Curated annotation (Swiss-Prot):
Full protein name: Putative ribonuclease-like protein YfkH
InterPro entries: Virul_fac_BrkB
UniProt keywords, alphabetically: Cell membrane, Exonuclease, Hydrolase, Membrane, Nuclease, Transmembrane, Transmembrane helix
Protein encoded by which gene: yfkH
One GO location term (cellular component): plasma membrane
Keyword ATP-binding: no
Broad class of the protein's primary localization: membrane
Compartment(s) of residence: Cell membrane
Record's keyword annotation contains NAD: no
Single Gene Ontology MF annotation: exonuclease activity
Topology in the lipid bilayer: Multi-pass membrane protein
Amino acid sequence: MSFLKELFSRYTLHEGQSKSAELAYFFLLSLFPFLIFMLTLTAYLPLSTDDVLGVIEQYAPASAMSLVESITHQTLNNRNGGLLSFGIIAALWSASNGMNAIVRSLNHAYDVEENRSFIIVRLTSIFLTIAMVFTILVALLLPVFGREIGRLASDFVGASDLFLSVWAAIRWGVSPLVLLIVFSALYVIAPNKKLSLRFVMPGAVFATIGWIIVSTLFSFYVSTFANYSATYGSIGGIIVLMIWFYLSGILIILGGEINALLHKRKKLPDENPYH
């Protein structure tokens, strides 16, 4: 059986569409707690709310982005400072629900049962959520400080304007690298199976490139051809957001299925699940 045919067969057998819809649902529920947790941390960094939202804006459809910005600003403005500590914990717990759904989907891809305890699985999801937040924050800080770092390096080594141009391209090329790191971490840590980084890179690269392409094309389609606000009214932004999350879920699951299929075809010694 060809690789693509077997991949499609596994995706269908593992109910990939249903799993993608489940991921979209939990992504939507987790989005704003995730943003609130991340924006709380930016209070201690030279970053603004707009800097954080700008990362999402690179990929999110415009109609969905306006909804995200509106709800995020409203939530932050109405936040009770006295409940901040509890709010951070609650936001982190809620945001980890999205990661929890990914854990279940990737276990399904590898045909492994989840025999880790509820606490271990939840802590894994929380760890992945925190890791994603800090990875995104690093990506945000690089453009902020990157220009000054580039100038200092240029003065030190006596480089030309070409160096500054290349450095600028590197700084603004951080987003794909961040995505690759996030997807790689997901595929290594999330499944109940011991996996090394080199065995998950094919799926991580696929998910990274696919997500950038699909997000860009979907954003172009929504802004050019489809007017969801005219069709669905005030919930148009939510519909667009759910479709975007659904497409993202498909790519994440396909990336996991690619890794699982390659793992199976290479007939590697099967590692025992965590106990």
